[in-house]
A protein has these predicted regions:
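An amphipathic, aromatic/His-enriched active-site/gating alpha helix that lines ligand/cofactor pockets
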Residues: 2, 25-42, 59-69, 73-113
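Active-site-flanking beta-strand signature of metal-NTP-handling nucleotidyl enzymes
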Residues: 7-14, 71
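Feature marks short, surface-exposed loop/turn motifs that line or immediately flank catalytic pockets
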Residues: 17, 48, 78-80
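A cross-kingdom feature marking solvent-exposed beta-strand/loop segments within repeated
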Residues: 48-61
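Specificity-determining recognition surfaces
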Residues: 116-119
Length: 122
């Protein structure tokens, strides 16, 4: 029986900060592709300076992260929808263009993905 739980994925990119406009173009392409194939894209988030006076809530436990990391997050309604997207996006011309952009510009140097589930409210 297929799992009907939503599939939420967070992707963290290590950016080449000299190629931000190329990365933004890449990001816009993937937002469109995710939504074309039935997902909800929650956006790409680029690094920025911390607000003045922003302190770590738990000194000794936390620290500010690196300034070259971008984050994206998207959700598909269920695993079947996610698998269908993965199959269909393989042949999308825009995916091929986005892959070529990354190869040509090296707008990011690595990425990692996390599959997540929400904490239910009490």
């Amino acid at each position: 029986m297929a799992n009907s739980k939503a599939v939420t994925c967070q992707i963290r990119y290590t950016l080449n900060l000299n190629k931000l406009s190329a990365f933004e173009s890449y990001a816009r392409t993937w937002m469109m592709l995710i939504e074309r194939y039935g997902g909800t894209h929650h956006g790409y988030f680029l690094p920025r300076a911390a607000p003045d006076g922003a302190e770590i809530s738990f000194p000794g436990l936390g620290n500010d992260g690196p300034g070259d990391v971008a984050v994206a997050m998207f959700t598909f309604p269920d695993e079947q929808s996610y698998r269908r997207y993965r199959q269909m996006v393989k042949t999308a011309p825009e995916r091929q263009s986005a892959a070529a952009l990354v190869r040509e510009t090296r707008c990011f140097t690595r990425y990692e993905r996390l599959f997540l589930k929400p904490v239910q409210r009490a």
